[in-house]
């Protein structure tokens, strides 16, 4: 059985993230979406809300589960009994940053990283941008899963 971890803060999860999850779920027997908590950062949505939003948005993926973690991604990956990370790439800048992280993860723990090119229709989408546009009254419904869009609209009223 092969498994992979899709790590991130997912504050909130976007359709771009879900696209990466779906593609990972098609390639691996098991996918764990790891919501990594940084205690120094205050997100718009708390951990329980993020877990619920991802679970609702990925209910159609039976081989995917959502877990919370903190610390090094590779420690989380190993604790899950896995040795692969899947990351979505939107731009060349993403690649430069993620390549360094992938090389470090391989060096310190033998964990491989698989990159998935984001679907072009989501290449500009980020959680931060979606939140900013929503807070200014813009429509981000085409960028977010419906359960997320609903919660974001409620939060930014």
UniProtKB/Swiss-Prot annotation:
EC number assigned by the record: 2.7.7.3
Annotated coiled-coil segments of the chain: none
Pathway(s) per entry: Cofactor biosynthesis; coenzyme A biosynthesis; CoA from (R)-pantothenate: step 4/5
GO molecular function: ATP binding; pantetheine-phosphate adenylyltransferase activity
Residues given in the record as ATP binding sites: 9-10, 17, 88-90, 98, 122-128
Disulphide-bridged cysteine pairs: none
Family in the record: Belongs to the bacterial CoaD family.
Record carries keyword Magnesium: yes
Positions contributing to substrate binding: 9, 41, 73, 87
Keywords: ATP-binding, Coenzyme A biosynthesis, Cytoplasm, Magnesium, Nucleotide-binding, Nucleotidyltransferase, Transferase
Full protein name: Phosphopantetheine adenylyltransferase
Biological role: Reversibly transfers an adenylyl group from ATP to 4'-phosphopantetheine, yielding dephospho-CoA (dPCoA) and pyrophosphate.
């Amino acid at each position: 059985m092969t498994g992979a971890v899709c790590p991130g803060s997912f504050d909130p999860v976007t359709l771009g993230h879900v696209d990466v999850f779906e593609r990972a779920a098609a390639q691996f027997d098991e996918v764990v979406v790891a919501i990594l908590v940084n205690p120094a950062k205050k997100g718009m949505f708390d951990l329980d809300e993020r877990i619920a939003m991802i679970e609702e948005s990925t209910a159609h993926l039976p081989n995917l589960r959502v877990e919370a973690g903190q610390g090094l991604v590779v420690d989380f990956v190993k604790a899950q009994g896995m040795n692969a990370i899947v990351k979505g790439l939107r731009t060349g800048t993403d690649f430069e940053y993620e390549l360094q992280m992938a090389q470090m993860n391989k060096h310190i723990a033998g964990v491989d990283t698989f990159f998935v090119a984001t679907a072009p229709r989501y290449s500009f989408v980020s959680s931060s941008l979606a939140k900013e546009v929503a807070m200014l009254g813009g429509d981000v419904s085409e960028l977010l899963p419906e359960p997320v869009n609903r919660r974001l609209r409620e939060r930014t009223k």
